[in-house]
Structure formats: structure tokens, C-alpha cells
């Protein structure tokens, strides 16, 4: 029997927040096998780590900073919030491990997965799910390392830790304590079954083109997949990428097209999409978020793109971003053995960029997810990169929603 409990407190003082959390945990009768903890980046990681390790000595641990706090079935935690998701499953097996990524992220990811499997006493076995939380920037390399062990036979789902203002103040939390350039891997062998979904809240605008040149191609496990692939698009259809993209968006970058610089805010509603295939006749897209205009009109992105790929200009709005979160959660619940009637709770990864764009309407997102999960316990974090499984392949994307549903 699987049981989930969520606890959220909101207080700018880490010490006071943990005192509130302690009182709430005292009222919960559960012995978790896995503890997920996410929190506003302004909190003190060392205090949070000390609290969790003292309270849940034998549990696997995964967590880190989340942009602007967390959400749960109780609503939006908001600034200063800390959230715990406690997963109890006496008949299941869970393990976690954490590593600093170092110069070779793929190798380190592979090592972390083997360590997590050993911690679950399941060395050499295929997990039902791999859940990851990591520092942004080398997600493709991390997935490549994990795939050396499990291929695409096992879903890899998770997020990239975030801060509150995109200044690099993100951290990750595992059994060894807080990290700034780390990866936490959890392996789940649930006795109640797991459902999952990985989607976005955008649609094609109609414009598309071929990536004809990419920028510097990283080496040594830091992003090369197969073809020439990089996080900088230099040319689309033989023209400077930023100029083409600006035309596609109707000129939203006109003021920055020559000066260059950050374009995160301008592009949140106009990401690039890559066709990942059809499900029930509906095309699904992996999103790529352009974040900078560089030299000679190059576009820097938060996910790698291969030369020769057709990319689509996507468009979104607040309403779609609010509604889609609930739909993704519902899809994960329906994917459970026994469907949503077998639901014990869930874990939601919602892009921090989308969260910032939705703004004061974010309580509606939490409400939509809660309704789709039948008001069962869930925890939602806000990330700067999302990982998920779509059409039999594990991928990294931006501005995405990743949902995991746990069966009883």
C-alpha cells in the first residue's frame, strides 16, 4: 500500500519555517521510504538538510531549490515556502544518491544511478522510474549517462533546480548535503504502480525553418548526443537565427536584435518547438527556450538543438499555461494501473519560466492540478529545465510540465 503526504509551510525565516514544519510532521503518521523536499532559494539549505536527515533517518532523499517556492493540494506556497512530499511504501524499494557533476557529467550521472540502485538494494535491476534533480546546463549529458545503464526502457523524469531571479543561486539536496553543481538521482520501485506525462501548454504559430548551423559543440560528456548539437543556433534556413526568429514572433525582439543580450522575458510565450511525434494523431513538441542574442545574430538556448532539425515557432498564453498543468496531471493519473481511481498522489514539475509568466494567477495552476489529482496529496516544484519520457525516449526540454502519479 502506497501513501503520500505533503506538508508546506511559508516563512522567510528558515528556522521558523522548520519549526512549523516540525509541528506539522509530528501530526503525520507515516514512515516514508522517499522524501522529496523543495524550497525557495532564499532559505538556508544546511538547516533544511539537518532537519530532514534528523527526522527521516532511513529515507532516500531528493530535492533542492525551486523558483519562488512550491505548490501542493493546499494551494500555492508562495515566497518563502518549503514543501515536503513523503512517500510511504512498505512493499516498494527506493534509493537515492548525489554527485557533483564535475567535468564529465555523463560519467557522474552513470555513477549516481549505480549508487542509487545499490542504496535501494536493487543493483542491476531496472527501476520503474528514475527521478532526477540537477543543476541547469548539462541536462542532455546527464540523460546520456543514465541511458548508458537503462537505455530508454525506463522513464527518466525530473527538473533542473532554480533560483528566484536566474542569477545562478540554485542548489540541489541529497543525502550528502547541499550542492551548487550537483545531481540527485532517485530510483523508484513502487508497489502501487506509476503513471507519468510530459507535455507543454503551447501550440505552433505556423512558422518553421531548418537549423542550418549551430555554435560551439561541447565535448567530454557535456552535451554531444549524436549529430552536431549545441545550445546555440547560429543560422536558420541560412540566415542569422535571431533575425528569422524575430520575424516569426512578429518583431518582439526588434529592440534587442542589434544590441543583443537577454531575451528570456520576451521569448517565454514564443519558444521554439521540435516535433517529437504523434500520440493519438496529435503532434507533440519538445520546447526550447531562447535566452540570449549573441554575436552575429546567434540564439543561445536552454536546450541543445541538432543541425538539420526543423524547428517551429510556438505560442502560448496564460490561460493555456494554467489549463495545461491540470491536463498533464490528469494524463499521468489516467496512465496508472487501474487509472485515476488507484491514485495515491503525485509529483509535478512546472517550468519556472511559465510560473513567472502566469504570475498572480498561479493559484489557479495549483487548483487545476489538485482537481485533476482528485485532491490527493501532491508536491509541485518550479524549475529551469524539465526532463521527461515521450514516445519511448527520454528528453530534456524547456517550458514543459512533467507529472508523476503514484498508485496505491
Please provide the spans of the model-predicted regions.
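Small-residue-enriched flexible segments
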Residues: 1-55, 59-60, 64-359, 363-372, ...
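Short beta-strand/loop segments at the ligand-binding rim of alpha/beta enzyme cores
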Residues: 375
Amino acid at each position: 500500500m502506497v501513501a503520500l503526504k505533503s506538508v508546506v509551510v511559508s516563512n522567510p525565516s528558515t528556522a521558523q519555517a522548520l519549526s512549523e514544519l516540525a509541528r506539522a510532521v509530528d501530526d503525520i503518521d507515516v514512515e516514508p521510504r522517499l522524501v522529496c523536499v523543495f524550497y525557495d532559494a532564499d532559505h538556508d539549505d544546511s538547516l533544511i538538510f539537518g532537519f530532514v536527515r534528523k527526522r527521516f533517518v532511513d529515507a532516500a532523499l531528493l530535492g533542492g531549490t525551486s523558483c519562488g517556492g512550491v505548490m501542493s493540494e493546499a494551494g500555492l506556497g508562495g515566497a518563502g515556502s518549503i514543501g515536503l512530499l513523503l512517500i510511504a511504501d512498505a512493499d516498494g524499494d527506493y534509493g537515492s544518491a548525489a554527485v557533483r557533476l564535475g567535468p564529465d557529467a555523463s560519467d557522474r550521472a552513470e555513477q549516481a544511478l549505480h549508487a542509487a540502485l545499490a542504496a535501494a538494494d536493487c543493483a542491476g535491476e531496472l527501476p520503474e522510474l528514475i527521478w532526477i534533480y540537477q543543476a541547469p546546463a548539462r541536462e542532455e549529458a546527464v540523460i546520456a549517462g543514465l541511458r548508458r545503464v537503462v537505455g530508454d526502457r525506463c522513464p527518466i523524469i525530473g527538473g533542473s533546480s532554480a533560483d528566484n531571479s536566474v542569477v545562478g543561486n540554485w542548489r540541489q539536496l541529497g543525502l550528502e548535503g547541499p550542492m551548487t553543481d550537483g545531481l540527485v538521482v532517485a530510483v523508484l520501485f513502487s508497489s502501487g504502480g506509476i503513471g507519468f506525462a510530459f507535455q507543454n501548454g503551447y501550440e505552433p504559430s505556423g512558422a518553421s525553418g531548418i537549423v542550418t548551423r549551430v555554435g560551439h559543440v561541447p565535448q567530454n560528456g557535456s552535451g554531444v548526443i549524436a549529430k552536431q548539437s549545441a545550445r546555440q543556433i547560429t543560422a536558420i534556413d541560412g540566415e542569422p537565427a535571431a533575425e528569422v526568429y524575430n520575424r516569426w514572433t512578429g518583431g518582439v525582439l526588434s529592440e534587442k536584435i542589434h544590441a543583443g543580450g537577454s531575451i528570456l522575458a520576451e521569448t517565454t510565450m514564443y519558444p521554439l518547438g521540435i516535433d517529437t511525434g504523434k500520440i493519438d494523431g496529435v503532434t507533440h513538441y519538445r520546447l526550447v527556450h531562447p535566452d540570449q542574442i549573441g554575436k552575429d545574430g546567434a540564439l543561445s538556448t536552454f536546450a541543445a538543438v541538432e543541425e538539420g532539425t526543423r524547428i517551429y515557432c510556438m505560442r502560448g498564453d496564460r490561460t493555456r499555461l494554467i489549463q495545461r498543468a491540470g491536463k498533464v496531471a490528469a494524463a499521468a493519473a489516467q496512465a496508472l494501473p487501474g487509472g485515476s481511481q488507484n491514485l495515491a498522489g503525485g509529483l509535478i514539475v512546472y517550468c519556472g519560466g511559465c510560473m513567472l509568466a502566469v504570475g498572480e494567477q498561479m493559484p489557479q495552476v495549483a487548483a487545476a492540478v489538485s482537481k485533476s489529482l482528485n485532491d490527493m496529496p501532491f508536491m509541485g516544484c518550479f524549475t529551469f529545465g524539465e526532463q521527461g519520457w515521450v514516445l519511448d525516449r527520454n528528453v530534456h526540454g524547456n517550458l514543459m510540465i512533467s507529472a508523476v502519479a503514484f498508485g496505491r
